[in-house]
C-alpha cells in the first residue's frame, strides 16, 4: 500500500514556498532544548509565536485555535511544534500553513491529551472539570481562546461547531482503509473526547 498526497510547500509553477515550523521560529533545537525540543512549551507559547510573526494575525489565530481543538478531539498526541508552520505569501507576509500530520495517535499508543509538555493553559487557569478529572472541557478551550486573542464571536462559532457530533466522522472512518477493529477504536476515541469536551 502507498499513501500519496499533494505537496503544499510548492506553488503551481513548481517553486518552493518558504516555510518555517514553530520550533524553528522559537529557535528550539536538539542542542538548545534537548532531544524532546519539539515537545517543549505550550500551545499558548505557540500562539505567541504566531502573533509575533504574522502581521494579520487575528484571522490566522482563529485557524490555529480551531486546529488545536481538532487535535484534541481527534486524539492527535503528536501535534508538536514542528507540526505547525508559517508560509510566506507572494506578497512577503506570512500565514499559517495548511494543516498537516493530522493523526489519531491513540489508536497506536496511550497518549496524553496534548503533545506539548506545557499543555493548553497554565494549571492556575484550569476549570473545575479539568482540575477534578485531569482532562479539559469546553470551558478550558474558551479560556485558551481568550488568552490567545481569538475574537469572542469567532471562538464561540468554532466551539459550537466542534461541540456537535459530526456524522461525517463516522462516514469517513467507515470508508477509510483502517481495519474494522481500528475503525471501532477511532470512533470510540472520538466519542470519548467529545463527551469530555462537552462536560460542564
Which residues make up each language-model segment?
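Anionic ligand-binding catalytic core segments
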Residues: 1-81, 85-200
Amino acid at each position: 500500500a502507498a499513501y500519496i498526497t499533494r505537496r503544499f510547500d510548492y506553488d503551481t509553477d513548481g517553486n518552493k514556498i518558504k516555510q518555517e515550523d514553530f520550533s524553528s521560529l522559537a529557535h528550539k533545537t536538539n542542542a538548545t532544548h534537548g532531544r524532546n525540543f519539539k515537545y517543549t512549551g505550550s500551545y499558548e507559547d505557540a500562539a505567541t509565536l504566531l502573533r509575533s510573526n504574522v502581521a494579520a494575525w487575528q484571522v490566522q489565530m482563529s485557524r490555529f485555535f480551531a486546529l488545536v481543538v481538532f487535535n484534541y478531539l481527534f486524539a492527535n498526541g503528536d501535534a508538536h511544534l514542528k507540526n505547525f508552520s508559517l508560509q510566506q505569501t507572494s506578497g512577503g507576509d506570512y500565514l499559517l500553513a495548511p494543516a498537516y500530520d493530522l493523526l489519531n495517535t491513540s489508536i497506536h499508543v496511550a497518549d496524553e491529551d496534548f503533545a506539548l509538555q506545557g499543555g493548553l493553559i497554565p494549571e492556575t487557569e484550569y476549570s473545575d472539570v479539568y482540575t477534578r478529572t485531569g482532562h479539559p472541557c469546553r470551558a478550558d478551550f474558551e479560556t485558551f481562546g481568550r488568552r490567545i486573542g481569538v475574537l469572542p464571536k469567532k471562538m464561540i462559532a468554532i466551539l459550537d461547531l466542534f461541540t456537535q457530533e459530526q456524522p461525517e466522522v463516522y462516514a469517513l472512518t467507515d470508508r477509510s482503509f483502517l481495519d474494522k477493529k481500528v475503525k471501532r477504536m477511532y470512533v470510540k476515541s472520538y466519542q470519548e473526547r467529545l463527551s469530555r469536551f462537552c462536560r460542564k
